């Protein structure tokens, strides 16, 4: 398993299927500005100019919304994951 550094977060995108009111499956979600993802690992946070550690706002296991074009896709064993900065995460889904 990869261990992210600083304010980086490792996520795995969740495939979502969008349906219209009539129940038709809409082709692709390319029109969306965000994607849904599951947080797999979180870095320790970032340090301020005074050296204080600011902990991340997300935790392992959270479901989050991430900007569509954010991150770097890497391979972790047989699994493709994406490394993003915490600032690329728009919201935590509750």
From Swiss-Prot:
GO terms for biological process: chaperone cofactor-dependent protein refolding. The keyword Lipid metabolism does not apply. The keyword Signal does not apply. SUPFAM superfamilies: GroES-like (SSF50129). It is found in: Cytoplasm. HAMAP family: CH10. Heptamer of 7 subunits arranged in a ring. Interacts with the chaperonin GroEL. Together with the chaperonin GroEL, plays an essential role in assisting protein folding. The GroEL-GroES system forms a nano-cage that allows encapsulation of the non-native substrate proteins and provides a physical environment optimized to promote and accelerate protein folding. GroES binds to the apical surface of the GroEL ring, thereby capping the opening of the GroEL channel. This is Co-chaperonin GroES.
